Amino acid sequence: MPEKLLKITYQGAGPQKKINAYLRMPSQNYTILRREIELYLFQERQLPKCDVRTFWIDADQDEIEIVNQNDYEIFLAKCESNMHVQVAPLAPIEEPKATKQEGSSANAEAPSVDDPSNFTIHDSVQCDGCGLAPLIGFRYKCVQCSNFDLCQKCESAHKHPEHLMLRMPTNNGPGMVDAWFTGPGLGRRCGRRSRGHCPFQEASQPAPAAEPARDSRRERRHARRHAGVLSQFVEMMTNLPLNTTTATAPAEPQKPKAAEQTESPPQAEPTVTAEKATESEAKPTEPMKVNTDQSVPTTEDPVTTPRSTEPTTPVINLDNLSQIVPPEYMRAGIEILNNFSEMFSKMIDTTDVGDSGIFAPSTTSSAENKKPEEQSQSSGQSAASSASQSAVPSAAPSANQSNVPSANQSATPSISGSISDAQLETEPLNPKPLETTTETEQDRRRSDSLDPEWQLIDNAYSANNSNLINLDTTNPTAAPQQPVRDFGQLGELLRQHMNEEARVEQASANTQTAQVDTVSTSTSTTSVTTNSVGTSPAAPDDKRTVPVYHTDERINQSIHAMMAMGFSNEGAWLTQLLESVQGNIPAALDVMHVSQTRN
């Protein structure tokens, strides 16, 4: 029968390696086993003597302690084929002494934070706050003063709080920090460094003209010695208000531009007097006097005098606008803006309404002015000569003097009997009878800021309309008898027209012609009432005649509908606008809204 052996593994404390050994199988007594293990390890191997514990590792890799005889018998039963006992010391050898030494060393290595023995000693440096010399701990050096240092206690007490302080944790500051802040001149070492072209000194040469006057030799010597880069930077930062005045000095030649901008505020003000407008356009209109004398009538000189104290429509500064907007878009833009400004001024001013409603359409001229109106439309918009431009303003007062008073007496009773229902719907749209003759031509003048070129373009189309909006002529006595505007009727007219447009698109060709006749007869009431202001009531055939603005029937109907709503077709701008959108009134209103918001 082979002899049984017991394997033991001992892992002692300290750097010694693990020891594996075999023992002959001792008796079945656990006490004898412990004695033989201690004899082998501590006497034969001469290992440091200590209390040991015995255990074994089962199949689950768990440590099973062997403490008494019962545990030893279980070990023999479980590990009969492979008996292996693990031996380990209960505690490290001389553990109490080691812990005491480690604790004492830890206390020695981690002293208190406020212990001065842990701080760096800055030799030959004295605290200017408390007089501590040498300075111990963190050294706080003032950046703006020549030689001012504080210890960490004085700095924590917020001494010298008005200047920037630099914290120096180590004692190598005099060689590095002084080169940055104080510059050369601190001794032979600094002199040698400055002779080697110190990079901090090259960019720190101050301009002789910018140097302030030194009062004494001490200040001049201090400036020579302490002329570092950061000291110059600190002086520049502290003297920022002085630097801003010198920086703005060369900007004085630009003051005339600022003065010109302050003299011409019409673009920002909603309402401007004619005096401000003439001042703003005085300079740009001087080189254009030759052209104005040749093309514009001489009646414009007395026009400006009576309007000098009365408010006008908003003025557009074309000097700045012409630099942004191309010239080809200026014409239509000016027409749209002027019409909008006149219409809104008419709607806002309650004392200027009278019996005319919101806006006077362009067909309120007399019978004498109607023939040149048709001739100018047939011959083209841009073919009007300078003679016709000067003749229309001069002929308008005489026509108004002879026709307007008779129209006020005879037009109303004849129309009220025939088309009373239509007159009720279009009451806010009826034109206002003119009361003055001399001020009519004065109000026809455009805003004062327009150049003569734009005035010529407007005068070319002035033959189409002899009456513009009167913003200055008011009748305060007739104010209590003014009818209230009914904007609901305007919306109803627009809705009816949109419904007619929808029906025209869905119906056949025969139905379209029938609806065209219906729309033309409904819109003819407005033209009849406007044409009958300057003339006596005509025959029934004359009332049904409607001026044709476009060959396309749909665009022509749209023009009449928008004129009934208060828009003017002066210069045929409304015809061009509706032609671009194929007679779609909502699309035309959107285009005008977008152009107005952009401007």
UniProtKB/Swiss-Prot annotation:
One GO cellular component term: nucleus
Record field: compositional bias (Polar residues): 291-319, 412-423
Functional note: Required for selective autophagy activation by ubiquitinated proteins. Implicated in sigma rhabdovirus multiplication and necessary for male fertility. Involved in activating transcription of Drs.
Pfam families (alphabetical): PB1 (PF00564), UBA_5 (PF16577), ZZ (PF00569)
Bias type Basic and acidic residues, positions: 276-286
SUPFAM superfamilies: RING/U-box (SSF57850), UBA-like (SSF46934)
Entry-linked InterPro entries: Autophagy_Rcpt_SigReg, PB1-like, PB1_dom, SQSTM_UBA, UBA, UBA-like_sf, Znf_ZZ, Znf_ZZ_sf
Protein name per Swiss-Prot or TrEMBL: Protein ref(2)P
Subunit structure: Interacts with aPKC and Traf6.
Zinc finger extent (ZZ-type): 122-173
Keyword entries, A-Z: Cytoplasm, DNA-binding, Metal-binding, Nucleus, Repeat, Transcription, Zinc, Zinc-finger
Ranges where the record places region 3 X 8 AA repeats of S-A-N-Q-S-X-X-P: 386-413
Keyword Disulfide bond: no
Location of the UBA domain: 550-595
Entries under Gene3D superfamilies matching the protein: 3.30.60.90, DNA helicase RuvA subunit, C-terminal domain
GO biological process terms, semicolon-separated: aggrephagy; endosome organization; mitophagy; sperm mitochondrion organization
Disordered: annotated span: 192-225, 245-319, 357-453, 507-544
Molecular function GO terms recorded: DNA binding; K63-linked polyubiquitin modification-dependent protein binding; protein kinase C binding; protein-membrane adaptor activity; zinc ion binding
KW Transcription (keyword) present: yes
Residues holding Zn(2+) 1: 127, 130, 151, 154
Binding-site residues for Zn(2+) 2, renumbered to this chain: 142, 145, 160, 163
Low complexity bias spans: 199-211, 375-411, 511-536
